[in-house]
Amino acid sequence: MPFPVSHVTSQSVAPGVAHYVVRSPQGPWTINVLSVDLDRCNVAEAVKGSDSAAGRYRTTALLAQLATHEKVVGGVNGDFFVLKDGAPTNLLVVNGRMLTPPNGKPVLAFDSAGVPHILAFTLSDGRLEPFHPMEAVGGRPIIVSDSAIDGAVDTEGNPGFRERNPRTAAGIARGGRRLYLVTVDGREYQNAGMTLRELGAFMLALGSRDAINLDGGGSTTMVYADPDSAGRLRIANHPSDKGGERTVGDALAIVHACGRTSQH
């Protein structure tokens, strides 16, 4: 699917992980993309920052905490959350441990082999079905399904989803071994944000077979390991809150895990 682009810059942040900045006059839009080859020792890890469901932290702080014992090369904010206490609204699984239960909405989940899936889970007799993921971060709705824009982009109950706003999304490429993490800046004169349908069109243009919308608006944040600063974690996008980066409920990190002998 064609997508209008005026300028693209790219840099490698780790073996198999590239950071792209895409500019389009159509919005206008500034879009950040992390393209992750899951066959190059790169794994996705959900990050909470505490051992309980509650708590709000900046995405940079969550990834920096993980970076004390893992080689974090990038990541984005995760699920929608309860403003009062920071608890994610959907399933959160960190290193195999369920911190919040499923709510019937879809999640981005990774099985024991690190294979990504976008689907809804149920809880039956204390067991997650259809399988117990190693990592899972919630979102809503599914925006691309089987290489087509999903009808949910026009039916999701929140009116803001049908308006242009900052966005965070995750996509799985055809074949299932490449992951796309995407942020779209918005609420600025030079950056309009996207509707979910526009976001779905971009995820398709990237090559996503399936994609899910994550928490957006002021929560939208992408972090990457800057190769020009010895891998220091930096914010790639422009968070839209006046105070800068928002505290969020959870995040999704990309870790370069070659040589790792144990789980985080």
Predicted segments, located by residue:
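Conserved, well-ordered active-site substructure
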Residues: 85-103, 110, 158-174, 178-209, ...
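Short, conserved active-site entrance elements at the starts or edges of catalytic domains
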Residues: 133-158
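Short, structured patches in soluble enzyme cores that scaffold and shape functional sites
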Residues: 112-114, 120-122, 139, 145-148, ...
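Short, glycine-/Ser/Thr-/acidic-enriched flexible segments
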Residues: 26-29, 39-41, 81, 115, ...
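Zymogen propeptides
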Residues: 1-108, 115-119
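Loop/turn elements at helix/coil->beta-strand transitions in domains of secreted/extracellular proteins
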Residues: 69-73, 115, 148, 175-179, ...
